[in-house]
Amino acid sequence: MPLADVFSLLVLGQGKSGLDVARWALAHPERVNAVTVYGGGTSEPNDATRALEAAGASFVYGTEQVEGAYDVCVTCPGISEFSGFFKAGREHAAQIMGEPEFAYRLSTDNWIAITGTNGKTTTTSLTDYLLKAAGEASVAVGNIGEPPINEIDGRAHNEWFVAELSSYQIATTTELHPRVAVLLNITPDHLGWHKSHKNYALAKIKLFDNMVDDDLVVVDVEDAGIHEFDEYIYTPGRRICKVAFDEPEGEDAAFVRDGKMIVRLKGVETPVSYTHLRAHETDQYL
């Protein structure tokens, strides 16, 4: 469901991304006609929330019992989708989502989204660097630095966002559609938020849900944690680039042959020169 031209906004949580969403909304009264922030059960006023209140936002502190009706609810990533607070937001808003999903719906950029239990920040930095080196307008966002919402204004159509996304953030997406999505690895993590390892893994894999055959899913096929969930990854119409040290089958792959990295896209191989990389660095460059 697209965002309305004008909508009322509910924000759950007063962490950085939640306050940044509220700040963006207040700066865009042509889009957002009311901003309400529920800070959470232990929340209290602070300098940042007072400044937003002075600018026109309404804050409710010390409770997770939401009242009222809203067009859009944006939740902070620390609020589990299985929590009573999240449920309250969903019951009182026509749509609920996390900050990356909200920013995606407002942006005109191409997105590259990178997730995994380990290695996200390094891979995001490398990807952003390579795009810039190729002359593309790119910005790294998400867990690596600024929330995407802080970077969407003033950008030309079809520039690039390189987003480092956690399982929390992906779990609260529905329409996020990266042009490229990277899954580095899966090991058990954040079980308190997701309630099970399977939920955690499927939240990561949810990143691929809206991708089509002219997008590119990049997966480390030698990671045992990823391999456990192959049935959810290899679905019809999904184009997958298999990453491995040993050469994998398929038209799309990245691997090492005779000491050089090889990238194969749609059957066409391109050697990528590199020297003096340690094993873990090679993995991240792949």
Functional labels for PLM-detected ranges:
Residues Y285:
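Cationic, low-complexity basic patches in intrinsically disordered or flexible, solvent-exposed regions
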Residues Q14, G40, T117, N143, ...:
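Cofactor-binding loop segments of dinucleotide-utilizing enzymes, especially the Rossmann-like FAD-
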Residues M1-G98, F102:
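N-terminal leader/targeting and accessory segments in enzymes
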Residues A253-F255, G259-K266:
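Short polybasic amphipathic segments
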Residues V35-G39, V217-D220, K242-V243:
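Short, hydrophobic beta-strand segments that form beta-sheet elements in well-ordered domains
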Residues P2, V6, E67-G68, P77-V221, ...:
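Phosphate-binding loop of NTP-binding sites
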Residues T275-T282:
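Conserved small/polar residues in nucleotide/adenosyl-binding loops
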Residues E269-P271:
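A short, charged helix-loop
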